[in-house]
């Protein structure tokens, strides 16, 4: 008897000697069955809500393990799958993300990261990000929504901001919570503020940097901006010294006393550090004075009348055609005068040409004319200059070859030369002897 598919998930049947006994599920199999059902129905997840603060770095990791269970065939408990998964993120209803939000995923086998610094304009407005995961092996997709609820910060923006350039880090490495925490701890030891936040992280490639060579584990570099509520420390101010500025202009490393606190993990380019004091910046914002929204009275509007006066275009038509025609006629007359009235003539040319040159030219023309006439009519007798006069052996005078009833036009050239009636074949004498090479 064939059992239902759902019953095969249970414990194998326990048969008694009398026949079929009671069938049941073991606790382990029951847990497996419930886990499978939960995995199948967990494809429909609820939207995830996050609450970042404006002006503070926001980091959200898209974990591959979170999406692996949503691609069929669903993995069994304890089974590990390593399918390549990529992510596509966009603002709901739009093809791309908001301007302040960035996304990076180095390889399909690594997690994706959403990061950025929320702006104050989006405070109180939920930002819905659609996250679509693609399984590159099975071509299955899964979609979730990330709702970003931006909260207002207490002291936004922080008045003192410093931007560091770290040469031995990539963006995805710096976004790790442990690495970012270690960097903020080192900055806090140097700066010693009461409040310190990471404001933004930017890759050096986004600032015009070059892609590093794949040798010696070279990194792209990353810019990290932090903000604090106290003025800059004396160590950070050392970058502004004239001696250090001179060394930076000569592409030499400046001498910073607190560099050893970062050197153990972070290689900072102190020549690219930027210190911004918001308290000394003069605000250029001008308050907009709003009016009443009423346009000044310009009188009653008077549209043009419907009955327009007729306009005569005859004069314009004549001017348009007459002027180009007159110019063309003048040019034609000038060209005709040059070509017809300014010619020297044949008589004048012959008078200025020497007689011997004219005779030579006339002979050439006569010969050319005779050859053309001969090519047109081949039935006439050959020129006497081309016929043999004396016999090559006897010396007798040979009568004319062509008679009136002789068709020379149908005779091949070789035949006329070989089968002449008064022509004697002259045997060729062959010389005997040895050939020497």
UniProtKB/Swiss-Prot annotation:
GO terms for cellular component: cytoskeleton; dendrite membrane; Golgi apparatus; plasma membrane; sarcoglycan complex; sarcolemma. Residues 1-317 are extracellular. Its main location: membrane. It is a single-pass membrane protein. It is found in: Cell membrane, Sarcolemma; Cytoplasm, Cytoskeleton; Cell projection, Dendrite; Golgi apparatus. N-glycosylated. Residues 418-437 are annotated as: Disordered. Keywords: Cell membrane, Cell projection, Cytoplasm, Cytoskeleton, Glycoprotein, Golgi apparatus, Membrane, Transmembrane, Transmembrane helix, Ubl conjugation. InterPro entries: Cadg, Sarcoglycan_alpha/epsilon, Sarcoglycan_C, Sarcoglycan_N. It comes from the Eukaryota. The chain crosses the membrane at residues 318-338. Residues 339-437 are cytoplasmic. Glycans are attached at residue 200. Belongs to the sarcoglycan alpha/epsilon family. Component of the sarcoglycan complex, a subcomplex of the dystrophin-glycoprotein complex which forms a link between the F-actin cytoskeleton and the extracellular matrix. This is Epsilon-sarcoglycan.
């Amino acid at each position: 008897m064939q059992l239902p598919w759902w019953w095969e998930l249970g414990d194998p049947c326990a048969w008694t000697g009398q026949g079929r006994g009671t069938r049941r599920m073991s606790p382990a199999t029951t847990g497996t069955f419930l886990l499978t059902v939960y995995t199948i129905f967990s494809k429909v997840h609820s939207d995830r809500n996050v609450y970042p603060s404006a002006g503070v770095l926001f980091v959200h990791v898209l974990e591959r393990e979170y999406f692996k269970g949503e691609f069929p065939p669903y993995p069994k408990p304890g089974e590990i799958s390593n399918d390549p998964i990529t992510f596509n993120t966009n603002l709901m209803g739009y093809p791309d993300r908001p301007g302040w939000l960035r996304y990076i995923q180095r390889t399909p086998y690594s997690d994706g990261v959403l990061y950025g610094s929320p702006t104050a304009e989006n405070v109180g407005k939920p930002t819905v990000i659609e996250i679509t995961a693609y399984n590159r092996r099975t071509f299955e997709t899964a979609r979730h929504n990330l709702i970003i609820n931006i909260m207002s910060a207490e002291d936004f923006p922080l008045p003192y901001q410093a931007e560091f350039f770290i040469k031995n880090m990539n963006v995805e490495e710096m976004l790790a919570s442990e690495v970012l925490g270690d960097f903020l701890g080192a900055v806090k030891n140097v700066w010693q503020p009461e409040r310190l936040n990471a404001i933004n992280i930017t890759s050096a490639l986004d600032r015009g940097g070059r892609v590093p060579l794949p040798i010696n584990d070279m990194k792209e570099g990353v810019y990290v901006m932090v903000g604090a509520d106290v003025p800059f420390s004396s160590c950070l101010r050392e970058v502004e010294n004239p001696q250090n500025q001179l060394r930076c202009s000569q592409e030499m490393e400046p001498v910073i006393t607190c560099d050893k606190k970062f050197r153990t993990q972070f290689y900072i380019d102190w020549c690219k550090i930027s210190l911004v004091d918001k308290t000394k910046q003069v605000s250029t914002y001008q308050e907009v004075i709003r009016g009443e929204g009423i346009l000044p009275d310009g009188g009653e509007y008077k549209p043009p009348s419907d009955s327009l006066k007729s306009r005569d275009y005859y004069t314009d038509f004549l001017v348009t055609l007459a002027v180009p025609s007159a110019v063309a006629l003048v040019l034609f007359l000038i060209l005709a005068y040059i070509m017809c009235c300014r010619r020297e003539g044949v008589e004048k040319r012959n008078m200025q040409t020497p007689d011997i040159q004219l005779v030579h030219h006339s002979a050439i023309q006569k010969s050319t004319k005779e050859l053309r006439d001969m090519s047109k009519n081949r039935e006439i007798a050959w020129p006497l200059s081309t016929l043999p006069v004396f016999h090559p052996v006897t010396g007798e005078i040979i009568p004319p070859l062509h008679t009136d009833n002789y068709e020379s036009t149908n005779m091949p050239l070789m035949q006329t030369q070989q089968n002449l009636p008064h022509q004697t074949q002259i045997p060729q004498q062959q010389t005997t002897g040895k050939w020497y090479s």
